[in-house]
């Protein structure tokens, strides 16, 4: 069909997979651009989004509904690095331990490792819509998984000695 749209939000609303998160993401990216290095402060999205509501396709919500956008908006690239670098280092170390475990044929331990690694990857999957990273429930769940991973890694490294 040759239907013309007044603005891109009209077009977005016609897409079968559109959930409305695109507008939240656009708003979040606009706010990140304003202060990319250190962000605007924890849980600041809900207060700062009103400043750009006059632009098309912008929506004000309580948080950006994506961990990466949430962290970038609140703490900037500096905060994202401080959060992601240790998590990535941990995942690499644990993955190396997981590979060592395959050689030892310790199947239960390997399945636990794999489940925890996948939980962390799924939790931080960049394109999924999520709650606020800095909310109590989401942070508790994330750091609980990371704690399990650290504990399991410590147990495995001690058993190798």
Residues covered by each model-derived region:
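Transmembrane alpha-helices of multi-pass inner-membrane enzymes
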Residues: 86, 114-161
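A generic structural signal for secondary-structure junctions
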Residues: 50-54, 99, 130, 149
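Long extracytoplasmic/lumenal interhelical loops at the membrane interface
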Residues: 9-34, 38-75
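Aromatic-rich transmembrane-lumenal/periplasmic boundary elements in polytopic membrane proteins
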Residues: 1-6
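Glycine-centered flexibility sites
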Residues: 39-43, 76-79, 115, 147
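Hydrophobic transmembrane alpha-helices and their immediate junctions
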Residues: 75-124
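Short coil/turn segments at secondary-structure junctions
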Residues: 11-13, 63, 105-109, 128
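Short, hydrophobic secondary-structure boundary micro-motifs
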Residues: 38-41, 58, 81, 133-137
């Amino acid at each position: 069909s040759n239907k013309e749209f007044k603005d891109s939000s009209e077009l977005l609303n016609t897409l079968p997979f559109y959930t409305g998160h695109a507008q939240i993401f656009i708003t979040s990216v606009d706010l990140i651009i304003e202060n990319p290095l250190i962000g605007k402060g924890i849980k600041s999205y809900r207060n700062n989004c009103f400043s750009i509501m006059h632009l098309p396709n912008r929506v004000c919500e309580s948080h950006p509904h994506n961990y990466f956008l949430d962290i970038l908006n609140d703490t900037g690239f500096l905060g994202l690095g401080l959060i992601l670098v240790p998590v990535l280092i941990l995942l690499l170390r644990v993955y190396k331990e997981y590979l060592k475990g395959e050689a030892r044929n310790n199947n239960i331990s390997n399945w636990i490792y794999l489940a925890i690694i996948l939980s962390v990857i799924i939790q931080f999957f960049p394109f999924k819509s999520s709650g606020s990273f800095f909310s109590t429930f989401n942070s508790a769940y994330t750091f609980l998984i990371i704690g399990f991973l650290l504990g399991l890694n410590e147990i495995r490294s001690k058993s190798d000695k």
